[in-house]
Amino acid sequence: MSSGGLLLLVGLLTLCAELTPVSSKDRPKFCNVPPEPGRCNANVRAFYYNPRLRKCIEFTYGGCGGNANNFKSGGECKRACGE
């Protein structure tokens, strides 16, 4: 296989992995915990996964503490927990 064909194959496999939704049984347990703003007073834009609505939602993170259901972007949240 040529290097161009191999590169195309790797790109397609990566795209497929990014677009494949996370099923609820494969979803990490931390995706099911409620958002925790943390104990500090910063106003950081963050995202958490809401299992009832089955989507990522923006919230204000305090900047420290909190839990694992806390993502810097909606895309990062979707990759980890699905949508």
UniProtKB/Swiss-Prot annotation:
Keywords: Disulfide bond, Protease inhibitor, Secreted, Serine protease inhibitor, Signal. CDD domains: Kunitz_textilinin-like. Residues 31-81 form the BPTI/Kunitz inhibitor domain. The keyword rRNA-binding does not apply. GO terms for molecular function: serine-type endopeptidase inhibitor activity. GO terms for cellular component: extracellular space. It is found in: Secreted. Expressed by the venom gland. Residues 1-24 form the signal peptide. Disulfide bonds join C31-C81, C40-C64, C56-C77. The record marks N41, A42 as: Reactive bond for chymotrypsin. InterPro entries: Kunitz_BPTI, Kunitz_BPTI_sf, Prtase_inh_Kunz-CS, TFPI/VKTCI-like. Belongs to the venom Kunitz-type family. Serine protease inhibitor. This is Kunitz-type serine protease inhibitor B. It comes from Bungarus candidus.
